[in-house]
Amino acid sequence: MNIQTLMNELFRWCADGAPHDYSGTCDTLKTGNPETEVHKVAVSMFATPAVIRAAHEWGAELLIVHEPTFYAHMDDNFAELGNDPVYKAKRELLEKTGLAVWRYHDHPHCKFKDMISEGEVRYLELDGEWIRGPRWAVNRFHLNTPMTPRELLKRVEEKLGARHVRVSGSMDLPCTNLSL
């Protein structure tokens, strides 16, 4: 299977049968050739130099990321980056490795259930139900068992290894509805 075929399959999978105009999407191939055959695919939230190196060393031909590769939502800021040393080093690393990078952002957020939020809920082992809203709306999740922000904060720290999580408002008010 080549990169373009894989991209088309993932686009179709996220469609949920609902029409949507993706003509302005950031879900594009940032580096590489869409005709490249794919045998290994790496997936990460970010295309950091460490992730790029690890994907290349693992033998991946394609790295799928959720966030921008070159610091702007559409990754169309090359002229303004110009001779920026960080940009140049990352661009050179991608050229050296030959790794293709595809940003897969808008389609996953458009799916019910939003794929990113669904992953967060699953990883945090939250028990509840999704509340369907309009496309592109804030994702809402109803907890079956009330939880305080303090309890949720502790779970985020433990499950995700996050430190210095900030919360505003009452820390001990039991909640059942989350916006993600």
Language model features with spans:
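Hydrophobic structural segments
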Residues: 1-180
